[in-house]
């Protein structure tokens, strides 16, 4: 029984994922998916997407530790980590996950604030006279 480790990232959220062959258990920060997310069905589907695409929701156990960012970023980091772990588990899953963009790190992060500006791009109000 081999244990596969993968890391997923999105914005400032990081997900550490351990995947083992099992019966479909999903533990996030020592909680079930429903406890961790509450009633956010769209975000739950985002997390389950790689498992549903590869039809592994009943044949692998996943234990994850997620920190940083908000719920949406954490869910996308978790999805990225699960996808990378499934890819390491069976290379045949790459053909399913890659076209959906699940193995690609989303590199969009918050743009830094520049000096002389109020925010990243917002300038102070201009007065002609």
Swiss-Prot record:
Record-level GO cellular component terms: cytosolic small ribosomal subunit
InterPro entries reported in the protein's UniProt record: Ribosomal_Su5_D2-typ_SF, Ribosomal_uS9, Ribosomal_uS9_bac/plastid, Ribosomal_uS9_CS, Ribsml_uS5_D2-typ_fold_subgr
Residues annotated as signal peptide: none
Domain of life (superkingdom): Bacteria
Keywords noted in UniProt: Ribonucleoprotein, Ribosomal protein
GO terms assigned for molecular function: RNA binding; structural constituent of ribosome
One of the GO biological process terms: translation
Pfam family, any one: Ribosomal_S9
Family of this protein: Belongs to the universal ribosomal protein uS9 family.
Annotated protein name in UniProt: Small ribosomal subunit protein uS9
Source organism of the structure: Helicobacter pylori (strain HPAG1)
